[in-house]
């Protein structure tokens, strides 16, 4: 609930949170607040009226002025009382097999698209399917960034484009790019060696054998390769992660607003070192899982002003009405 009910007892906060987050009656609420228990199926707005608190939904996420354009602040706040889904991206050729395995294990799922399934968040799929080989656990909005990558790869008119995932982290987007075009000449980098070790294991499961893994700190200017080396650069940069806080709601209470500027400075350093590696006519894709404009639209302005790339497309991927994360993606082209 963020800081929306600061002047109440801990017990009252717990009971209120349980009521707001429950979608069906339960024994705990029946014991503590029976008059609320049979009203769990009501909407968040109706529940807020019932509790008769000075709880302002807008104060769940009090940084409204920092939000990217187009985000409905009230709907975004309401989404924190709904458990996000677990999303699977089905790998090419494995779609039917995965669905059959889930059905046999009596695991409920909803078909979002041909390659995307939504499951209850607590679903145990590890023992049912071969993760990374048959399907990848990947949020819906993160999967949507694949559409931008697909268009970018197609625009390069090269069956084996050189691609650099410069902030590879868990490698989900690299696997997705490989599924879009298995012929890509893939380079992944991260500042942490442990990440590259884990990537190697994950790529082995995913069947990705031909790639380069490089330890690189993009906060500094030193690189293990020359400039203008890649046709496509993906920068899924470190950020506040504010678009994912439905999965880590404690951030609503503990987040320090000064961290927005801290990450903004870091993002400028990363893109300033990554963009020079882009070939003429190449494509640069900037991605965050943030809802803050300083990390999103203001970074687009920074890139346009300092590197003179052409903005092809940018979009806030609103996941708050889909039980998913919210993200931001911008696509640029380096003209000749």
Where are these regions (language model features)?
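S-adenosylmethionine
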Residues: 1-336
């Amino acid at each position: 609930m963020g800081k929306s009910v600061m002047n109440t007892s801990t017990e009252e906060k717990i009971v209120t949170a349980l009521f707001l987050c429950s979608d069906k009656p339960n024994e705990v609420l029946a014991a503590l607040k029976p008059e609320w228990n049979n009203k769990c199926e009501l909407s968040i707005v109706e529940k807020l009226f019932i509790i008769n608190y000075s709880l302002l939904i807008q104060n769940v996420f009090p940084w409204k002025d920092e939000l990217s354009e187009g985000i409905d602040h009230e709907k975004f706040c309401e989404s924190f009382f709904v458990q996000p889904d677990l999303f699977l991206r089905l790998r090419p050729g494995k779609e039917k097999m995965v669905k059959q395995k889930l059905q046999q294990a009596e695991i409920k799922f909803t078909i979002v698209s041909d390659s995307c399934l939504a499951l209850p968040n607590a679903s145990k799929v590890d023992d049912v399917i071969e993760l990374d080989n048959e399907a990848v656990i990947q949020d819906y909005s993160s999967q949507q960034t694949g559409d931008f990558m697909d268009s970018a790869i197609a625009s390069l008119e090269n069956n084996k484009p050189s691609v650099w995932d410069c902030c590879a982290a868990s490698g989900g987007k690299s696997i997705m790019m490989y599924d879009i075009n298995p012929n890509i000449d893939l380079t992944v980098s991260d500042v942490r060696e442990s990440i590259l070790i884990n990537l190697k294991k994950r790529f082995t499961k995913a069947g990705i054998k031909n790639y380069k893994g490089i330890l690189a700190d993009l906060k500094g200017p030193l690189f293990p390769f020359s400039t203008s080396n890649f046709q496509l650069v993906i920068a899924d940069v470190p950020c506040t992660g504010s678009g994912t806080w439905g999965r880590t709601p404690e951030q609503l209470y503990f987040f320090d607003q000064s961290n927005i500027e801290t990450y903004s400075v870091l993002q400028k350093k990363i893109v300033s070192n990554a963009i020079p590696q882009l070939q003429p006519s190449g494509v640069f894709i900037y991605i965050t899982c943030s809802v803050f404009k300083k990390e999103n639209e203001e970074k687009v302005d920074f890139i346009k002003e300092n590197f003179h790339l052409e903005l092809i497309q940018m979009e806030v991927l609103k996941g708050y009405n889909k039980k998913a994360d919210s993200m931001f993606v911008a696509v640029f082209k380096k003209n000749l």
